[in-house]
From Swiss-Prot:
The keyword Transmembrane does not apply. CDD domains: Yos9_DD. Residues 104-222 form the MRH domain. This is Protein OS-9 homolog.
Length: 457
């Protein structure tokens, strides 16, 4: 247990390192959220045709901001029909899969790791072999048609996501059914960026009938797996505040792009990194009633709870970076500090995140605003990369090797879900995701890129 002075609020951190970031239609999908003046907004909502093609909504209950979003459900529907009926789209997807899997056999374990590993080979035939820890093997299925489209078809999951299905039959005989084993491979564009080339999940849906769900990031580049690919740039949301009186928060969004994290927390990335540093914006959820424990908590205490719950997602967003703008890697030791502001841009407090050489992850919230005067623009109070030190024999700052047992494996989590509901940021995110569901795309994640039209003098 780590103790800091009583003037500081301290909490424990579970530190998760993120893998590479890449374009992914299911995570951090950009939407242009533009605030306009009254005249431009009325030109939209007074247009009957546009109203029939879209919807009006408020970012959260009680908000005096009204937003319009055009509805493209018919375009999505037509795209899905084209995908399922297009031989060209099927050939394109099959070719992509074969380019990834061939020519060398691919051996992988499931996530989470199990007793079995799985080997997919693509030679004269495509085979899937199940291999046990002590070397026992079972042929789950094979196909000599993997270079054609005979054994493939597009399908849709229960959540509406398109995937490519391939069925392999004639595996070794099952001891229970006395029939050949068979396996279906589902090739899927992952919801979030992966920290490894492949992600495998396996289920035995019936005795000796298997389902392999293989997540391949490269599939996200194909429009067959992403019906909004190439069209999101044309899909904008416009908003207007009644009385043309804009909130001071909009000045923040003139200078920063904002990503909704969770629990009322925004990640603010400066549009001019030479002028502004990264910071967090926080809106504490209101208590549900006078009896709730939230009512008795300070803003700092409520932030700590919300921040801990959102920490995995924060690390996965690559928001915390080295002084040179590179992703944090295992072995990096640092103290990262950032201001936390409210919706009007007023400083609430500072948040410190430290990972030290004793494998201790420490978080601290304090109200010493003077620390901002000496804070580097890149937010790192200090930074030392053990990876660099270990390869530099002449370095005088080489750090001793330490156990990282308190730091979770960098490959521990690919997809992070949060059941929490509440707070302005979460409500805004929910509304935008509801809009996505209305246009037939239920699994999308939303990143809000704020653009404000400045008044002309």
């Amino acid at each position: 247990m780590i103790f800091l002075p009583v003037t500081s609020v301290v909490f424990a951190i579970s530190w998760i390192y993120s893998g590479v970031s890449a374009f992914n239609p299911y995570s951090s999908t950009p939407y242009s959220l533009k605030y306009v003046d009254e005249q431009e907004f009325l030109s939209v909502i007074d247009n009957e045709t546009l109203l029939q093609e879209g919807r009006l909504f408020r970012p959260y209950e009680g908000s005096d901001v009204l937003c319009y979003q055009r509805n493209t459900s018919s375009l999505i529907q037509h795209h899905e029909e084209d995908t399922f009926n297009s031989e060209g789209a099927l050939i394109e997807a099959v070719n992509m899969v074969n380019a990834i899997l061939a020519p060398n056999p691919i051996e992988m374990n499931t996530v989470p790791i199990s007793y079995w590993t799985y080997i997919i080979s693509s030679g004269e035939t495509r085979t899937v072999v199940q291999k046990g820890y002590f070397g026992e093997t079972y042929l789950l299925g094979n196909s000599s048609n993997y270079n054609s489209t005979i054994d493939y078809h597009f399908a849709k999951s229960k959540t509406g996501r398109v995937y490519l299905s391939e069925t392999l039959v004639d595996g070794c005989t099952c001891d229970l059914t006395h029939k050949p084993r068979e396996v279906e491979i589902q090739y899927i564009c992952p919801k979030r960026p992966l920290s490894r080339p492949f992600h495998l999940e396996v289920r035995e849906i019936q005795s000796c009938k298997y389902q392999l769900r293989l997540f391949l990031p490269q599939l996200c580049e194909l429009s067959s797996f992403n019906p909004l690919l190439g069209q999101l740039s044309e899909h904008n949301i416009i908003c207007h505040r009644s009385g043309s009186k804009l909130s001071p928060a909009l000045d923040i969004f003139n200078r920063y792009s904002a990503t909704v994290l969770d629990h009322g927390i925004y990640l603010l990335k400066p549009k001019n990194s030479a002028k502004d540093r990264r910071q967090l914006m926080y809106h504490a959820a209101e208590p549900l009633d006078s009896q709730t424990t939230l009512f008795e908590l300070t803003v700092e205490e409520r932030f700590i709870g919300d921040f801990i719950s959102s920490l995995k997602k924060l690390i996965g967003s690559d928001f915390i970076q080295s002084p040179t703008g590179k992703s944090i890697k295992p072995g990096d030791l640092f103290l990262w500090r950032a201001p936390v502001v409210d919706e009007t841009g007023n400083l609430l407090f500072l948040i410190d995140l430290e990972l030290n050489s004793a494998s201790e992850a420490i978080g601290k919230v304090n109200n010493d605003a003077s620390l901002l005067n000496e804070l580097p623009i890149h937010n790192m109070v200090y930074f030392d990369s053990m990876t660099v030190n270990q390869t530099d024999e002449t370095s005088s700052n080489s750090l001793p090797e330490k156990s990282t047992g308190l730091v979770p494996d960098i490959f521990a989590t690919d997809e992070i879900e949060s059941p929490y509901k509440g707070g302005t940021a979460q409500e805004l995110k929910d509304k935008l995701m509801e809009a996505f569901r209305d246009i037939g795309y239920p699994d999308i994640e939303v990143e809000i890129l704020e653009e404000v039209v400045e008044e002309q003098n």
